Amino acid sequence: MLFATTLVSAIGPKKGLAKGPMGPAEHLYLYEKTPVEDHAWTIVEHGSWGKMTILFNKMFFVFNGHKLVADTQYTLISYREPGNTWPATNCAILGTGTADANGNVHIMGFLMPLLVYNEYPTDTSNEYSGTGAKVWLVLSNDMDGTTLQDWNPAEYLFEGDLLRLPSLI
């Protein structure tokens, strides 16, 4: 079952709302992972990573990625599970950015594109249970509109956990 919404709660390594000058925020961490067929993917120690800060009261986010390939364009997406077919279509584009000479990328925007929520486990993914959205940083060249057409997982950052619907709903 797939559905979309703009309400989101980030459940990650750091639980609970952080209070900042712009109001309550949550954080979602993305990591470089080692793809392992039929097993949970492991986080690459000292690998590329990113942090997404979501400001609920403004439905605004900021993403900062680190240790990326310099001068490479990246796209932050909300990934739609493809079922048992490939490629994954109708992924939500949250923003794009180019890594600077130090391998850092900065992407920010409003959560106006609908985040894609999947019901887990799915035909293609059993690492989670419940409902949530996967957020990935992928190579912009691997996207064709909202379709993730190419697969280069060693070059991507993957969620540390799902973005989940707020518990108030």
Q: Which residue stretches match the model-derived regions?
A:
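Secretory targeting signatures
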Residues: 1-14
